[in-house]
From Swiss-Prot:
Gene name of the record: rsmG
Pfam family, one: GidB
EC number: 2.1.1.170
Protein name (database record): Ribosomal RNA small subunit methyltransferase G
Database matches in PANTHER family: S-ADENOSYL-L-METHIONINE-DEPENDENT METHYLTRANSFERASES SUPERFAMILY PROTEIN
Catalyzed reaction equations: guanosine(527) in 16S rRNA + S-adenosyl-L-methionine = N(7)-methylguanosine(527) in 16S rRNA + S-adenosyl-L-homocysteine
UniProt-recorded Gene Ontology molecular function terms: rRNA (guanine-N7-)-methyltransferase activity
Residues given in the record as S-adenosyl-L-methionine binding sites: G75, L80, R141
């Protein structure tokens, strides 16, 4: 199956609507990762078909479960899930936070080449980033531990009064159900939802853990 067909079929299976032009930009993004990967080792996945499923479709699968006008992707790495999210939802403002200089340089180049006017790249450690308004969604697939995610990125979540009606959410992209991590969750954040996701082309388990501030 060629990449364009694989992508279109995957998007349809996920029940998403993404314009043809933005599907083409998603494929352009994939090609850009492959190009940079030869030198900078952005991802251990090398095979294009696997990369499309493991990175692009895996990122797009979160779309029905996140929202708000301001999204932060912390520990963004190669721009996952932030760049696919930004391409699929150009009306959202997406901030990519990545402290590794080579990866941050890739993100800046991708932003320019893909014409991502709704994307900002911050080349700093996430715990040092400050946002006056806070973010509706702070998402990451970089963390192996939920407690670390809360500790380092929790301050970026908008508080209820800043949102008008609701507080922001921390959203962690996980593999198997994280029983042990949930048991160690700090008291400052509680579970809002845990969703099991099916990714087209992947057999591996995927879960989305949604956290909110305790008391909000």
């Amino acid at each position: 199956m060629n990449p364009a067909t694989q992508l279109a079929d995957g998007i349809a299976t996920l029940g998403l609507s993404i314009t043809e032009s933005n599907q083409a930009r998603l494929l352009q993004y994939l090609a850009l990762i492959q190009k940079w990967n030869r030198v900078h080792n952005l991802t251990a996945v090398r095979e294009p078909e696997a990369m499309l499923a493991l990175h692009v479709l895996d990122s797009l699968a979160v779309l029905p479960h996140i929202g708000g006008s301001r999204i932060a992707d912390v520990g963004s790495g190669a721009g996952l899930p932030g760049i696919p999210v930004a391409l699929a939802r150009p009306e959202w403002r997406v901030v990519l936070v990545e402290s590794n200089h080579k990866k941050a340089a890739f993100l800046q180049q991708a932003r320019i080449e893909l014409g991502l006017e709704n994307v900002e790249v911050i080349g700093e450690r996430m715990e040092g980033v400050r946002s006056n308004a806070g973010f509706n969604t702070v998402i990451s697939r970089a963390f192996s531990d939920l407690a670390d995610f809360v500790k380092l990125a929790g301050h970026l979540c908008a508080r209820g009064e800043e949102q008008g009606t609701d507080c922001g959410r921390l959203v962690a992209m996980k593999g198997v159900y994280p029983h042990e991590e949930l048991a160690q969750l700090p008291e400052t954040f509680i579970v809002d939802n845990i969703l099991s996701l099916t990714i087209p082309g992947l057999r591996a388990k995927r879960h989305l853990v949604v956290l909110k501030r305790a008391g909000q």
